């Protein structure tokens, strides 16, 4: 018992003596990595007054500071930023061009066919819009608007719209972003094969139309659009100084109307007339629907023509006025 009491007393004395020694122990030194802070990158100098004025003039003129060429580098605070005014204008124009197809063309063609074929024609217009959108997303935009050969663009550069961002599209318009430009051109790709539907109405099934459009986009539209509109296209008289044919196709006279018109004629010759044509009366289902569709096409054409200026500028205004007079 005495040994136990002595042991406990000795342990208490040792604990009491060691406590102040532990309290006075110096703290561990801070790691060297935490003490040294990473150097901050130098801040870019703000542009001076003259540069700011040049930026505003370039924005209004839809170009880059110090150059009328939209391909020049924009070395300013506005670098990598698309112009909100031009971008907003182009988004409205893109919606108007889609409005021409859905529901403009669908109602226009639906009113001209017989009652039993109205739904078929409308479904074909909607089906084409969805199909072409997928093709455009996968590789269509890349085949048309990337640099490749004079006949066709690169398959992979913008595949799945990779790299198509909100940054300015310096190949075609410095103050319109790449994604907005891509969506605007998609609406042209949608309406072009949809125009062919009217020539083969009541003579091709829905599945046959979609198969034809898929082949036609790769065989006709993508190569022709690149040759006329591509930055290194064979017939691009605007951007390609080495173009063999100096064509200026402002709003798709060649890419949209000639391609769809000639293709529709070929299809008509292959398919022949409708069964009973010239023997059985084939009255239009509804001229009211046809008239409504015509009005929608008129409205949508402002986006089609004015938007082809790729800027809210004087050229777009001139196209807007000319479209009104031509329609009247």
List each model region and its residues:
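Bacterial N-terminal signal peptides
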Residues: 8-16
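Hydrophobic alpha-helical transmembrane bundles of multi-pass membrane proteins
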Residues: 3-8, 20-328
């Amino acid at each position: 018992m005495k040994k136990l009491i002595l042991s406990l007393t000795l342990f208490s004395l040792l604990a009491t003596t060691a406590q102040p020694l532990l309290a006075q122990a110096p703290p561990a030194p801070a790691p060297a990595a935490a003490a040294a802070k990473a150097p901050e990158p130098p801040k870019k100098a703000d542009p001076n007054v003259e540069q700011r004025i040049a930026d505003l003039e370039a924005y209004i003129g839809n170009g880059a500071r110090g150059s009328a060429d939209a391909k020049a580098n924009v070395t300013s605070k506005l670098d990598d930023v698309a112009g909100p005014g031009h971008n907003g204008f182009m988004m409205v124009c893109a919606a108007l061009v889609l409005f021409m197809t859905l529901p403009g063309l669908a109602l226009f063609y639906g009113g001209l066919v017989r009652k039993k074929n109205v739904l078929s024609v409308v479904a074909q217009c909607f089906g084409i819009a969805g199909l072409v959108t997928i093709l455009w997303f996968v590789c269509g935009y890349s085949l048309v608007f990337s640099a490749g050969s004079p006949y066709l663009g690169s398959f992979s550069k913008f595949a799945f719209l990779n790299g198509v961002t909100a940054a300015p599209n310096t190949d075609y318009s410095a103050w319109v972003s790449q994604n907005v430009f891509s969506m605007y051109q998609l609406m042209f790709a949608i309406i072009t094969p949809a125009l062919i539907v009217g020539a083969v109405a009541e003579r091709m099934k829905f599945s046959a139309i979609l198969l034809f459009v898929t082949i036609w986009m790769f065989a006709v539209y993508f190569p022709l659009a690149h040759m006329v509109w591509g930055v290194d296209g064979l017939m691009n008289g605007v951007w390609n100084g080495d173009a063999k044919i100096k064509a200026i196709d402002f709003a798709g006279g060649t890419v949209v109307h000639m391609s769809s018109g000639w293709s529709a004629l070929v299809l008509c010759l292959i398919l022949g007339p409708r069964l009973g044509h010239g023997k059985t009366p084939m009255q239009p289902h509804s001229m009211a629907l046809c008239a409504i569709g015509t009005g929608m096409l008129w409205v949508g054409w402002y986006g089609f023509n004015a938007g082809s200026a790729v800027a809210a500028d004087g050229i777009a205004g001139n196209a807007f006025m000319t479209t009104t007079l031509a329609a009247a």
